[in-house]
Design a protein with these regions (language model features):
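Peripheral (non-transmembrane) domains and long loops of multi-pass membrane proteins
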Residues: 1-27, 77, 219-325
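Alpha-helical transmembrane cores and adjacent cytosolic helix/loop segments
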Residues: 1-239
Length: 325
């Protein structure tokens, strides 16, 4: 058994094992690609505030990949007495760290952009000698931004967005979503640079503000999603748009058991895997341990994401439990 095939006590199916290996490769590729991008932009950043903001955004975009790869080291570990539920929350913590970092730096950049606009800072973009020719540095800035956008928009962004639902990984989904939207930063930075070139100085600051607001929005979304998941909200899909359908499947399965009259479930997302608390109202007064064990095994077989299952016979279903309707 390979380490990529184990999440806590859950052994991943072949599809998920392949997906996690691909995700790791894409995250490593993204780090290398973005590092090269950061170095190239540093050579041409000049005094353009829009370019500086785009440059910083590229640095921030490394956080989700580092958080994902770091969290992956923890979620593979089996539960212990010290951590009886395993370390699956590490993925949610990584998601939260990424969101807070984006939000904090985005706010700082937005304040800087607004301050520059209010004070009327006029950025200047000079010329450079290249192959014996004098070239306006702005053209190099535009060329660099056009080239570097190819990776996130056309390659690793779409690739990660296909892997995120397979792995039920919200951090990977957020990473892919930000990468696919990177074209907005590119367009804004190009507009800011060209604005300086034609004498509209405030376009540079406005572009920097636009990019900053995008960073703030990414930070807010990721922070909000991570916090509500860590606070054990009702388990939702990888994109957080809908309640996860597995809850309904579990309730339907339990109701199909001949000894179960009614059933409901509380399901929380541990970070890629679920902890299940199922409540059943038996048709008869006594329930055997065999019945409970067989039902728990059946629930586990429904989906690879089922990590822990607890089934409690009750006289009345809890109001907060999901009846699957």
């Amino acid at each position: 058994m390979t380490t990529t095939g184990q999440f806590g006590r859950t052994t991943l199916p072949d599809e998920q094992q392949q997906a996690i290996r691909k995700a790791v490769r894409w995250e490593v590729f993204t780090i290398v690609y973005t590092s090269v991008t950061i170095a190239v932009i540093a050579l041409v950043v000049g005094e353009s505030q829009a370019m500086r903001t785009a440059w910083i955004e590229d640095m921030l975009s490394l956080i989700p990949q580092v958080a994902f790869l770091t969290a992956l080291l923890f979620v593979r570990r089996r539960p212990t007495r010290k951590h009886p539920y395993g370390l699956h929350r590490a993925m949610g913590v990584g998601h939260l760290v990424a969101g807070v970092a984006l939000l904090a730096v985005g706010l700082n950049l937005a304040i800087e952009a607004v301050t520059g606009l209010i004070s009327g800072e006029h950025p200047t973009i000079g010329t450079v000698q290249l192959f014996g020719q004098t070239i306006w540095l702005g053209w190099l800035m535009v060329a660099v931004m056009v080239v570097v956008i190819v990776g996130p928009v056309f390659f690793y962004g779409p690739a990660k967005s296909k892997l995120a639902p397979v792995l039920h990984n919200k951090l990977l989904y957020a990473d892919a979503d930000m990468a696919k939207a990177d074209w907005q930063t590119t367009v804004a930075s190009i507009v800011g640079v060209l604005g300086v070139g034609i004498g509209i100085w405030w376009l540079d600051g406005a572009a920097a503000l636009f990019i900053s607001l995008g960073i703030i929005w990414d930070g807010f979304r990721n922070t909000r999603t991570a916090i509500v998941d860590l606070m054990d909200q009702r388990a939702r899909t990888y994109d957080s748009k809908n309640p996860h359908p597995l809850a309904g499947d579990i309730v339907s399965y339990l109701r199909s058991r001949p000894w179960v009259a009614e059933a409901a479930v509380r399901m929380r997302d541990q970070g890629q895997v679920f902890h299940i608390e199922a409540f059943v109202v038996p048709r008869r007064g006594k329930v055997t341990t065999h019945d409970l064990s067989a039902a728990a095994a059946g629930i586990t077989d429904l989906d690879w994401k089922v990590q822990d299952v607890v089934i409690a016979p009750v006289e009345k279903l809890p109001d907060e439990a999901d009846p699957g309707r």
